[in-house]
């Protein structure tokens, strides 16, 4: 985190987390994804074929959101792919109700304490986007491990009563849910 501060998560107040906390990483960060892939590959090369290894546990208890500029831009790209036009997005989110129509994609930011909080469609899409980011991150981890040993089954633990991500979607990328 000291060498690559961009891997640290940003909270809803647009403040970057400090080193040392749990779950303080940005799942969107290309640097973080690359470093995790390198670590997963090295660990898999060392341990995947050990007879005591019967299942590979990916990252522990996926959780949380990041509001960094990169995540904001990826959210906008995800929305553009989903809706195509701002007009479609405005209609789907019913933004005219509170006179919050968007006229430029750069105006769209993740819902939170410093931004929009009353647009339910935006909140749901943010949850969907966050799930997508987590799932692609998790699947990249799985793929790195299974590139070393394709027969190795992968798992991650999903927490009870946790609503940040769609667990049914995450489960599609695992061999076993734990």
Give a label for each model feature.
Residues 3-4, 9-176:
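Polysaccharide-binding and catalytic clefts of secreted carbohydrate-active enzymes
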């Amino acid at each position: 985190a000291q060498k690559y501060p961009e891997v640290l998560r940003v909270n809803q107040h647009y403040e970057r987390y400090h080193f040392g906390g749990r779950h303080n990483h940005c799942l969107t960060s290309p640097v973080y994804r690359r470093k995790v892939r390198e670590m997963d590959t090295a660990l898999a090369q060392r341990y995947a074929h050990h007879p005591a290894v019967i299942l590979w546990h990916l990252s522990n208890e996926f959780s949380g959101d990041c509001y960094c500029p990169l995540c904001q831009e990826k959210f906008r790209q995800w929305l553009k792919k989903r809706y195509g036009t701002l007009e479609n997005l405005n209609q789907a989110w019913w933004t005219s109700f509170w006179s919050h129509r968007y006229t430029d994609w750069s105006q769209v930011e993740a819902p939170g304490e410093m931004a929009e909080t009353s647009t339910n469609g935006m909140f749901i899409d943010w949850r969907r986007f966050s799930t997508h980011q987590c799932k692609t991150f998790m699947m990249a981890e799985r793929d790195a491990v299974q590139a070393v040993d394709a027969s190795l089954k992968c798992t991650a633990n999903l927490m009870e009563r946790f609503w940040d991500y769609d667990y049914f979607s995450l489960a599609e990328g695992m061999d076993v849910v734990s």
